C-alpha cells in the first residue's frame, strides 16, 4: 500500500500551520477571489477536511459508504451554500479551526490500516490525500497576500 500521502499531507499541514501563524488579521480579511477571503478559503479547507474526517471515521468503524454519500461531480452548490456559514465565523477562529481539523484528519487517515485504505477507489467519498486540496488553496492564499511590485 502506497502511504506517501502521509508525508504529503504532513507537508501541506506544516505549510498551513506556518501560514496561519504569520497571517495578520488584515490579511485574513483579504480577498482571494471574487467570493472568498483568506479566512473563508481556510474555512473551505476546514469544511472539506471535516467531511473527510467524517468518512474516515466511518471507514475506521468499518461502516459501508452509501450511494447518497458519493460526492457529486459538481460541488459548486456545496461550496456556495456553505460560504455564508463559513463567513459567519470569526476569521482568526476559522484559521485556527482549519489547522485543528487538518491535524485531526491527517492523524486519522495515517492510522487507518492498509486493508481499509486499499478498499477505497475513485468513487469513494473519502480521499485520504488531503494535501492536494489543501495545497491548491494555500497557493491561492499565498498569491493573494503576496506584495504587489
For each of these PLM feature ranges, what is it?
Residues 31-76, 114-149:
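Short, contiguous alpha-helical
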